[in-house]
Curated annotation (Swiss-Prot):
GO terms for biological process, alphabetical: translation
The name this protein goes by in its record: Large ribosomal subunit protein bL31
Any Gene Ontology CC annotation: ribonucleoprotein complex
Function comment: Binds the 23S rRNA.
């Protein structure tokens, strides 16, 4: 690796806005705020959230009188 061209890595405090949990990683920035993390994402927590896409399709069909 060339010297003097790579950014410096510092300990970074990452805060999940949704769950309020904090953890530390290495990054080029000292602090990050994220919307979702492994503490609150349904894939990692095991909780299922159903997204109602059928409702949106039905609204579209009603709006344009489609069957």
């Amino acid at each position: 690796m060339k010297k003097g061209i790579h950014p410096n890595y510092v300990p970074c405090k990452v805060t999940c806005v949704t769950s309020g949990k904090e953890f530390e990683v290495l990054s080029t920035k000292p602090e990050l705020r994220i919307d979702i993390s492994s503490f609150c994402h349904p894939f990692y927590t095991g909780s299922d959230k159903v997204v109602d896409t059928a409702g949106r399709v039905e609204k579209f069909k009603q709006k344009y009188n489609m069957k």
